[in-house]
């Protein structure tokens, strides 16, 4: 289902489901990130519901970003909350190891300097893209992930464009999500 035009990252609390027919294979990316084989296979078979919430913190004025991955069948999900301030946050994630994550609003100009693939086809404008940079400290890899909106065959979708670099190896992929609707609260 199309993401409505009035849904943006400036102030949202909405959910999306993976559109496998429009997604690229994540196998190379997950391998480069050190994901075990069995987890890579599960990731390619399970359709995760994604919830994204953004809001302005009344005390700091910063935009906050909450990302939830909810797999089916009662499997454990993952939730992460960040300020869009690009201040590093270190954490350990099962199957990915020690990470240093920075999150901010992204612009096409900034993203093109990293890799022209990142902003390709995405809607441009203020607050239209969120850039998450993840340093994989255990394996010396860097992932740039862009959350945005893209029109594909006349339909507006939530899209993530991802570039992973590990040494001289580079993986690029696009994940596409169908809009499931607003969330309460």
Curated annotation (Swiss-Prot):
Disulfide bonds: none annotated. This is Pericyclase pydY. Pathway: Mycotoxin biosynthesis. GO terms for molecular function: isomerase activity. The lineage of its organism: Eukaryota, Fungi, Dikarya, Ascomycota, Pezizomycotina. It is an enzyme of class 5 (isomerase). Pericyclase; part of the gene cluster that mediates the biosynthesis of pyrrocidines, fungal natural products containing a macrocyclic para-cyclophane connected to a decahydrofluorene ring system that show potent antibiotic activities toward Gram-negative bacteria. Within the pathway, pydY is involved in the late Diels-Alder cycloaddition step that leads to the formation of the decahydrofluorene core. InterPro entries: Pericyclase_pydY-like (IPR053037). The gene is pydY. Its EC number is 5.-.-.-. Keywords: Isomerase, Virulence. Belongs to the pericyclase pydY family.
């Amino acid at each position: 289902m199309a993401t409505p035009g009035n849904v943006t990252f400036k102030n949202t609390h909405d959910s999306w489901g993976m559109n496998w027919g429009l997604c690229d294979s994540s196998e190379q990316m997950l391998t480069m990130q050190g994901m075990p084989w069995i987890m890579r296979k599960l990731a390619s078979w399970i359709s995760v519901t994604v919830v994204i919430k953004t809001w302005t913190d009344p005390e700091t004025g910063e935009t906050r970003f909450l990302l939830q991955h909810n797999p089916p069948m009662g499997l454990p999900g993952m939730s992460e909350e960040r300020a869009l301030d690009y201040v590093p946050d270190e954490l350990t994630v099962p199957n990915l190891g020690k990470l240093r994550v920075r999150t901010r609003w992204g612009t096409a100009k900034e993203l093109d300097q990293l890799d022209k693939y990142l902003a390709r086809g995405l809607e441009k404008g203020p607050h239209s893209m969120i850039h998450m940079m993840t340093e994989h400290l255990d394996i010396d890899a860097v992932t740039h992930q862009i959350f945005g909106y893209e029109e594909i065959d006349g339909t507006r979708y939530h899209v993530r464009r991802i570039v992973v670099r590990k040494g001289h190896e580079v993986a690029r992929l696009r994940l596409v999500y169908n809009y499931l609707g607003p969330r309460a609260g």
